[in-house]
Curated annotation (Swiss-Prot):
Sugar-modified residues: 190, 295
Domain of life, per lineage: Eukaryota
GO MF, one annotated term: serine-type peptidase activity
Membrane topology value: Peripheral membrane protein
Gene Ontology BP term (one): proteolysis
Protein name: Wall-associated proteinase
Function, as annotated: May participate in wall plasticization and/or intussusception or in cell wall turnover.
Cellular component terms (Gene Ontology): extracellular region; membrane
Subcellular location: Secreted, Cell wall; Membrane
Enzyme Commission number(s) from the entry: 3.4.21.-
Keywords tagged on the record: Cell wall, Glycoprotein, Hydrolase, Membrane, Protease, Secreted, Serine protease, Signal
Keyword Secreted: yes
Cell membrane as UniProt keyword: no
Length: 309
């Protein structure tokens, strides 16, 4: 029986794509990004199956641009003890390795970043076989995913959340997490060097704090500014700013975000830069039940020199 089908032009400017939706042989929604110039090739949709069950909560979801399309990743659970990394929008599909096996995770953390072209990188936590220490895992997702890369150097806590950003001048990624210290400092790791580096001034971070990172890249100076937001032990929204050059980040002083409402203790956090002038943060304030927006205007005072603590 022929599949239902519909198509529209990708609204992203200059994408040069048609978005073709249809049903697979398993009667699940598929999406192919077909070039408007039909002589160009395309990648056929591969159906890895739908995870019967729910999107895990508490957990994390992460969105990134890939091939001019917004893709949302999540952790799904098919009613057993196993949890899988999945695409949950614009289609719903398990992510599989090259052996067509779904990618498992035991934890709630998930982050993603993009080169704004064909590559997404998805980060999650797992226990490497035979070890008691959680590690950061990286999936490079193009038209399909590769085998996970394990970052063996960093030692994230099992309840850590993750944030990830892409540095286009070096084609590097920076991943941020909380460590297994008695005080849960935040750390960063570079995808090339893979060694953990403590962020001074973040010793007040709440255990299992949500993390959000936004960026502004300066192509001329080959540098990038990272705005990292987290919850402290008093449930206040904190900000710390880092300047990326080459493989290093120079961090400035952490600050409580002025005027931001206290955070609900189990809220997650996300943010986006608006016109290079302010960061729009979304989180659930204490005593509320819905995500609210808070605008944090970028100021010179963000770049005070760092201090220990």
């Amino acid at each position: 029986m022929a599949s239902p089908v519909t198509v529209l032009e990708n609204p992203i400017p200059k994408s040069g794509q048609h978005l073709l939706f249809f049903l697979t042989s398993k009667q699940q929604l598929a999406l192919e990004q077909r070039p408007i110039e039909s002589s160009l090739g395309y990648s056929a949709y591969v159906d890895h199956g739908v995870s019967q069950g729910v999107i895990v909560n508490p957990s994390s979801i992460a969105a990134a641009m890939r091939s001019s399309l917004v893709t949302v990743y999540g952790i799904t659970k098919p009613g057993t003890d196993k949890q899988y990394i999945s695409v949950i929008s614009p289609t719903y599909n398990l992510i599989a390795n090259r052996q067509n096996q779904p990618i498992e995770t035991t934890q709630k953390a998930l982050a993603a970043c993009s080169d704004n072209d064909r590559n997404n990188w998805v980060y999650y936590l797992n226990l490497p076989q035979g070890t008691p220490q959680y590690a950061i895992y990286e999936l490079n997702i193009q038209d399909s995913s590769s085998a996970p890369t394990v970052y063996s150097g960093p030692t994230p806590s099992g309840n850590s959340n993750l944030a990830a950003v892409y540095f286009s001048p070096n084609k590097d990624r920076f991943i941020i997490f909380s460590n297994t210290d008695t005080r849960h400092y935040l750390y960063w790791v570079n995808s090339t060097l893979q060694s953990a580096n403590r962020i001074s001034g973040t010793g007040s971070v709440m255990s299992a704090s949500p993390l959000a990172a936004t960026t502004i890249t300066n192509v001329q100076t080959r540098s990038m500014t990272i705005f990292l937001y987290y919850m402290d032990v008093n449930t206040l929204l904190n900000r710390i700013v880092g300047k990326v050059t080459d493989n290093e980040i120079h961090w400035y002083a952490n600050q409580v975000v002025e005027g931001a409402p206290p955070m609900k203790v189990d809220t997650l956090l996300t943010g986006v830069v608006v016109e290079g002038k302010w960061n729009c943060l979304y989180y659930i304030p204490d005593g509320d039940t819905e995500f609210r927006a808070f605008n944090d205007t970028i100021r010179d005072s963000f770049f005070d020199e760092p201090r220990e603590g």
